[in-house]
């Protein structure tokens, strides 16, 4: 069995989600090859070649893959399909757009967000917002799989794979890049952060996020997250959303402030190693999954907590 892992990268380096998806790909057995598709992405390909367990790296370096458009990348993967038995990618927003297209073009079923490889054709995945585990056995000759990376350990370095150039596939021409607005931040990326501080609808405004949540996050060196209710209310940007319809995270420490704990939010963070909840409602569902809970007014205790942590750092 030969598996093609599609790498998530920034052209210069490999994202941590790729390292974790590699662990899942290796569990299928057989060789694992990595596809790096981008523009001026040689550095990312070289980084992928150093990952333990990678047999070969395919580099598709073309302007068509510069802006994460789903159609050209899906066409490339399908063009490579005759040589592979399985196609694996992290279950990130990018590949949630790409991999269903690959599955449709190959006329197979996609197995989404697996959390365990039972055998090369059998997988476990969460359903019902993580409240049940489904075992899926795929009879398709070619497997298309996305990986919930929060449940897999990251593969380390130690490899020395060859890097080969892959011919670009014909662009379907179904979409074109218009532009992008990039939000830059000195904080860690949400899905790979060790610590996350999240705010909910109780924050009441974008200004309160900036006044209470962000200073605490900065003191802890943390990423900032938000519940869907807070995002829908306009208190936080979409890329901060944690939950079933947002980003799934599993940091070492997750601090939930003013978050009631809707089932959709819990599905995105309940695998965190330590969960701390601050909420004035003692019956809030968030306390059912929290390791530590504080029933208090966030507007009083969060500034005190931020100040106390600041003093510890001096």
Question: Where in the sequence are the language-model features?
Answer:
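N-terminal glycine-rich FAD/FM-binding segment characteristic of electron-transfer flavoproteins
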Residues: 1-314
């Amino acid at each position: 069995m030969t598996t093609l892992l599609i790498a998530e990268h920034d052209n210069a380096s490999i994202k941590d989600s790729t390292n974790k998806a590699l662990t899942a790909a290796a569990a299928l057995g057989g060789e694992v090859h990595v596809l790096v598709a981008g523009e001026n992405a040689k550095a990312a390909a070289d980084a992928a070649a150093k990952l333990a367990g990678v047999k070969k790296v395919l580099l598709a370096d073309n302007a068509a893959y510069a802006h994460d458009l789903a159609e050209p990348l899906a066409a490339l993967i399908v063009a490579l399909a005759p040589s592979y038995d399985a196609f694996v990618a992290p279950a990130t927003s990018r590949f949630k757009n790409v991999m269903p297209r690959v599955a449709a073009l190959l006329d197979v079923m996609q197995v989404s967000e697996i959390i365990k490889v039972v055998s090369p054709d059998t997988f476990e995945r969460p359903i019902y917002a993580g409240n049940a585990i489904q075992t899926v056995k795929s009879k398709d000759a070619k497997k298309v799989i996305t990986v919930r990376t929060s449940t897999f350990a990251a593969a380390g370095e130690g490899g020395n794979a060859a890097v080969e150039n892959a011919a670009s596939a014909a662009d379907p021409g179904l979409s074109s890049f218009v532009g992008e607005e990039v939000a830059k931040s000195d904080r860690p990326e949400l899905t790979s952060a060790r610590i996350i501080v999240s705010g909910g609808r109780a924050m009441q405004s974008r200004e309160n996020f900036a006044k209470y949540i962000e200073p605490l996050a900065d003191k802890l060196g943390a990423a900032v997250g938000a519940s869907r209710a807070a995002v829908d209310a306009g208190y936080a940007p979409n890329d901060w959303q944690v939950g079933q319809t947002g980003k799934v995270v599993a940091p070492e420490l997750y601090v939930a402030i003013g978050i009631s704990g809707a089932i959709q939010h819990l599905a995105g963070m309940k695998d965190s190693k330590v969960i701390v909840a601050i909420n004035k409602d003692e019956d809030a569902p968030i306390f059912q999954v929290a390791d530590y809970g504080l029933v208090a007014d966030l507007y009083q205790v969060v500034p005190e907590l931020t100040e106390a942590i600041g003093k510890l750092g001096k």
